[in-house]
Amino acid sequence: MLPLIGRNWQWVESDCWTLVRDYYKSKGLILPDWDRPPEEDFANNPIFDQCWQLAGFHELQDDEPLQEGDALLFNIYDDKPNHVGIFLDDGNILHHFKNQLSRCDSYGRWLQQSTSRRLRHDAFKP
């Protein structure tokens, strides 16, 4: 498996969902992969909202604090979830924006405002 930080972006081969799957794999959890539509079709109809429950995630309540390993769905310049990342215990997220290297960023105001769903895998319930 490639290192989680510093990956080149490539649709399906090395994108945000691939990074999330590899993060969980490093924790001993295998998440499903889906046949993703061509990139331009995904931009018009992202599949994240259709898939998170099938992958074993549940949505956190508003009063539940984030914990390391929680998944975050983002609406990045869109009204639909088109990006996913992982919350890390130091207040950062691990994610992979299109045409950029995978990285950790502060889970600051802009990313918090862009968050559409806060998810926890059923295997990581407290």
For the regions a language model picked out, list residue spans one by one.
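Short acidic/glycine-rich loop or secondary-structure boundary segments that cap or lie
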Residues: 29-33, 42-43
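Active-site nucleophilic cysteine motif
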Residues: 8-27
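Surface-exposed patches in mature extracellular/periplasmic domains of secreted proteins
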Residues: 11-13, 31-36
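Glycine-rich, flexible loop/turn motifs
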Residues: 5, 30, 103
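...with weaker cross-activation on analogous glycine-rich loops/strands in unrelated enzymes
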Residues: 37-101, 107
